[in-house]
């Protein structure tokens, strides 16, 4: 991938982008094999690769500069503002809207927040695009309600220029610290969620719910999990750390009941709405801590799917899964290092199948799907 920001050494987030993409995949595959299954008899399936540009559906932009010259991007290594509105990770429609927003913020006279002076208002622009419809969800993260009047006054111009913006909200984050968002979300549009489709499965995206940032690869991840689950054909399964329900919505079937557990209520609201749209009766969701949920259960279904955050399952949950003894565990991980640690603690289980998905090109990160069976 040719990236002027990387060449200039002003942005190094994609630290592998100077390597040919095929070489990145080969190296990553070798590294993952050495980490996950160096000496085990495991079925290692070919990786699912990504486009190397224009694959990302979400942008998190720091608002820098001044009201008369706002910049959406990051601070470079020298602490200088760097506009990333033309970042090659974003599809052209996202680049166009981000570039427009820089000028729109200037015209609206909205002062960027200055973390050194602790002055100003606008902290972040969070932009999500539906791969399926091309519609956008735009969130302004601001220090206070003072920004609302200027945003609302200039909103008609923005919507007229980009009618594909479906959801607009202002998130109030008043504290002076490196926190992306606050508790209060103020919607400026009647619509409060974005609709995405993966493999004909509707996925409702609300402002605070986690959603995969590489939709093409995520679609294949969910489809693969569904295939593996249908081979097992459990009558019941759990989806722990289910988020907006991507795995649960794909795996539920007339003869497979799924319970999805996620601590974030907004993500559960999205998952429940998606299930209603699909008309699935044997799919339920609850806003609970996954470890506390499993601790309250006397037994486990035949299959438990887990998709934890980067920190992994942790010793408490791995111990509970050991005790509950489901026959199969399907582990999807964005951090193979913590996954390997968790699997080592699941000593009653044997790894039988692995496939990785290049959700994060030009980095060392990968999404790994692993099937474990009880010995």
Curated annotation (Swiss-Prot):
UniProt: [4Fe-4S] cluster binding residues: 3, 11, 14, 87
Gene3D superfamilies assigned: 2.40.50.1070, Vaccinia Virus protein VP39
Positions with a binding annotation for S-adenosyl-L-methionine: 212, 241, 262, 307
Origin: domain of life: Bacteria
Swiss-Prot/TrEMBL keywords: 4Fe-4S, Iron, Iron-sulfur, Metal-binding, Methyltransferase, rRNA processing, S-adenosyl-L-methionine, Transferase
GO molecular function, one term: iron ion binding
Residue spans crossing the bilayer: none
Gene Ontology biological-process annotations: rRNA base methylation
Enzyme Commission (EC) number: 2.1.1.189
Reactions listed under catalytic activity: uridine(747) in 23S rRNA + S-adenosyl-L-methionine = 5-methyluridine(747) in 23S rRNA + S-adenosyl-L-homocysteine + H(+)
Database matches in InterPro entries: 23SrRNA_MeTrfase_RlmC (IPR011825), MeTrfase_TrmA_AS (IPR030390), SAM-dependent_MTases_sf (IPR029063), U5_MeTrfase_fam (IPR010280)
Keyword Calcium annotated: no
Active site: 334
Functional description taken from the UniProt entry: Catalyzes the formation of 5-methyl-uridine at position 747 (m5U747) in 23S rRNA.
Family assignment from sequence similarity: Belongs to the class I-like SAM-binding methyltransferase superfamily. RNA M5U methyltransferase family. RlmC subfamily.
Descriptive protein name: 23S rRNA (uracil(747)-C(5))-methyltransferase RlmC
Organism of derivation: Vibrio cholerae serotype O1 (strain ATCC 39315 / El Tor Inaba N16961)
Gene: rlmC
């Amino acid at each position: 991938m040719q990236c002027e920001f990387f060449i200039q050494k002003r942005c190094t987030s994609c630290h592998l982008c100077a390597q040919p993409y095929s070489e990145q995949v080969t190296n990553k595959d070798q590294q993952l094999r050495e980490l996950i299954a160096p000496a085990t008899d495991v079925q290692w399936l070919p990786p699912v690769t990504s486009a190397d540009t224009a694959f990302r559906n979400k942008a998190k932009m720091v608002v820098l500069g001044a009201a008369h010259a706002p910049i959406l991007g990051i601070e470079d290594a020298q602490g200088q503002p760097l506009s990333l509105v033309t970042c090659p990770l974003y599809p052209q429609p996202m680049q166009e809207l981000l570039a427009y927003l820089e000028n729109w913020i200037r015209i609206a006279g909205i002062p960027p927040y200055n973390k050194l002076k602790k002055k100003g208002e606008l902290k972040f622009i969070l932009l999500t695009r539906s791969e399926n419809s091309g519609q956008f969800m735009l969130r302004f993260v601001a220090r206070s309600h003072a920004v609302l009047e200027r945003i609302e006054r200039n909103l008609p111009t923005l919507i007229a220029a980009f009618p594909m913006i479906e959801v607009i909200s202002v998130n109030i984050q008043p504290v002076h610290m490196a926190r992306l968002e606050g508790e209060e979300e103020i919607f400026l549009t009647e619509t409060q969620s974005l609709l995405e489709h993966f493999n004909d499965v509707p996925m409702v995206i609300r402002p605070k719910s986690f959603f995969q940032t590489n939709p093409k690869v995520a679609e294949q991840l969910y489809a693969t999990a569904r295939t593996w689950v249908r081979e097992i054909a459990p009558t019941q399964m759990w989806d722990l750390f289910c988020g907006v329900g991507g795995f649960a919505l794909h795996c539920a079937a007339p003869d497979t009941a799924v319970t999805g557990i996620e601590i974030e209520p907004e993500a559960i609201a999205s998952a429940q709405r998606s299930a209603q749209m699909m008309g699935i009766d044997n799919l339920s969701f609850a806003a609970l801590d996954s470890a506390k949920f499993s601790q309250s259960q006397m037994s486990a279904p035949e299959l438990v799917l887990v998709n934890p955050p980067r920190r992994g399952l942790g010793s408490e949950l791995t111990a509970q899964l050991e005790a509950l003894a489901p026959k199969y565990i399907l582990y999807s991980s964005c951090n193979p290092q913590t996954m390997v640690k968790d699997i080592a603690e699941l000593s009653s289980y044997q790894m039988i199948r692995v496939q990785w998905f290049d959700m994060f090109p030009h980095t060392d990160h990968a999404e790994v799907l692993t099937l474990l069976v009880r010995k």
